[in-house]
Curated annotation (Swiss-Prot):
It comes from Styela clava (Sea squirt). GO terms for biological process: defense response to bacterium. The modification Phenylalanine amide is found at F52. Has antimicrobial activity. This is Clavanin-A. It is found in: Secreted. GO terms for cellular component: extracellular region.
Amino acid sequence: MKTTILILLILGLGINAKSLEERKSEEEKVFQFLGKIIHHVGNFVHGFSHVFGDDQQDNGKFYGHYAEDNGKHWYDTGDQ
């Protein structure tokens, strides 16, 4: 009787361990999928901010990339 219970217990633990491994691989796939979604959303937000953000105008003025703004700053330096 004890031997039978011991064998059933060992077999049961083996089945649980196998299902745990299968579940773990499914969870990893879900996390990888969510990671890809988060990555793409981050890229979209980053691109959106570059297209519609104010940095497109202000960076050129601050660093003097525009021909009419060379040597000037968009803020008042007080020494002009």
